[in-house]
């Protein structure tokens, strides 16, 4: 009888794989939601906020880290785990996290996805990746395989933690035995952050709608970008009958510079871009991603 | 042999002949299309009026991605023209664009004669006179105009 009660207690204290999976999904939503918010405000504030795009790219993971660290400090769980009422405990002793484990958890939780995202971005853009980057990506593949194996073992109750990261840190997930003791200020802040969680879901839904609109919806007619005022000599030099502004001959392999809208020969614009990094007509900075091949039917 | 630079220069020459701008002219030397001789007539209503100033333009195979080297052969008293005839003009240096053809270059230099930029002087005497003693400046300019008749 006592043994049966003890078994039931243990089973009730162990979260199911579905709650863990849901909490991980919520954690993974933070970065794209923040990026989407930055994009929105960035576009509204100033179109030429171009230089600070890098800052935005680095600001989102930093804010994500701060959010996760706050939750790990106050509730011994990540943002997503806290939302589903879970808590991280030391596997052997059942104690809560110490400072070092909090820091390590937040860092691994935030920057492993960040590094992987960077690697995949570079590979999809066909940039020259060095051998160590290839090996690092292979390591990520191995990690995901190990995680899948861990999840399976956890599902069949063979392992006490669901992820290699948790095994590495010596942690496991449990339901807290008593409600968290917090002061008023902490309670208010964490409640506001939980409201933010619903907002994240809304942003995801909005983003999906946004993408769907872009694919098949009706396009509002955008205002044409104003034409840059060129010096008089340049205006007079530009060809009148559709020739390439650089070689002044018939355009071969037409390529548009999406930053300025002018069309050049592929060879002319690429050689100029590699040397100067600017549009030949407007001097706006351009990169290879700004060149658009134009096909004639 | 035909290279992008030479094809572009033949195009520039053709445009210069078909649609000649006012007050400037130019043509390649007989045996080398990479070296041009040009003439700029002094703009009206300026001290340079009636002057005929000769220039040489040297192109490289990197043209039009790199600007040519342009020098006055005639003596020119101007804040932005060096003693050796070199020209201090932004579109021939950091603000060069491959869309400038020979016609645009010569027209820009002609405009420079009307509107000097004394803040980046190539000839400090001319820049100083232009700012402080306009009468003496114009007298010196007229002297080089008369000199250009003889050349």
Swiss-Prot record, chain A:
InterPro entries registered for this protein in UniProt: PEX12, Pex_N, Znf_RING/FYVE/PHD
Residue ranges that the UniProt entry lists as topological domain Cytoplasmic: 45-48, 120-124, 220-297
Location of this chain's protein in the cell: Peroxisome membrane
Pathway in which the depicted protein is active: Protein modification; protein ubiquitination
SUPFAM superfamilies for the chain: RING/U-box (SSF57850)
Membrane-spanning segments: 17-44, 49-73, 99-119, 125-158, 192-219
Zinc finger extent (RING-type): 244-283
UniProt-listed Pfam families: Pex2_Pex12
One MF term in the entry's GO annotations: zinc ion binding
Isomerase among keywords: no
Keyword line: Membrane, Metal-binding, Peroxisome, Protein transport, Transmembrane, Transmembrane helix, Transport, Ubl conjugation pathway, Zinc, Zinc-finger
One GO CC term, this protein: peroxisome
First-listed, main subcellular location of the protein, grouped into a coarse class: membrane
Superkingdom classification of source: Eukaryota
CDD domains registered for this protein in UniProt: mRING_PEX12
Binding site for Zn(2+): 244, 247, 265, 268
Ranges per topology, Peroxisomal matrix: 1-16, 74-98, 159-191
Function recorded in the entry: Component of a retrotranslocation channel required for peroxisome organization by mediating export of the PEX5 receptor from peroxisomes to the cytosol, thereby promoting PEX5 recycling. The retrotranslocation channel is composed of PEX2, PEX10 and PEX12; each subunit contributing transmembrane segments that coassemble into an open channel that specifically allows the passage of PEX5 through the peroxisomal membrane. PEX12 also regulates PEX5 recycling by activating the E3 ubiquitin-protein ligase activity of PEX10.
Sequence similarity: Belongs to the pex2/pex10/pex12 family.
Oligomeric and partner information: Component of the PEX2-PEX10-PEX12 retrotranslocation channel.
Name of the protein described by the UniProt record: Peroxisome assembly protein 12
Organism: Drosophila melanogaster
Encoding gene (name): Pex12
UniProtKB/Swiss-Prot annotation, chain B:
SUPFAM superfamilies named in the record: UBC-like (SSF54495)
Swiss-Prot/TrEMBL catalytic activity: S-ubiquitinyl-[E1 ubiquitin-activating enzyme]-L-cysteine + [E2 ubiquitin-conjugating enzyme]-L-cysteine = [E1 ubiquitin-activating enzyme]-L-cysteine + S-ubiquitinyl-[E2 ubiquitin-conjugating enzyme]-L-cysteine
Primary location: nucleus
GO function terms (MF aspect): ATP binding; p53 binding; protein domain specific binding; ubiquitin conjugating enzyme activity; ubiquitin-protein transferase activity
EC number: 2.3.2.23
Name of the coding gene: Ubc6
Entry GO CC: cytoplasm; HULC complex; nucleus
InterPro entries, per the entry: Ub_conjugating_enzyme, UBQ-conjugat_E2_core, UBQ-conjugating_AS, UBQ-conjugating_enzyme/RWD
GO process annotations (BP): centrosome cycle; centrosome separation; DNA repair; endocytic recycling; heart development; negative regulation of apoptotic process; negative regulation of DNA damage response, signal transduction by p53 class mediator; negative regulation of ERK1 and ERK2 cascade
Record's subcellular location: Nucleus
Pfam families according to UniProt: UQ_con (PF00179)
Protein name: Ubiquitin-conjugating enzyme E2-17 kDa
Entry keyword set: ATP-binding, DNA damage, DNA repair, Nucleotide-binding, Nucleus, Transferase, Ubl conjugation pathway
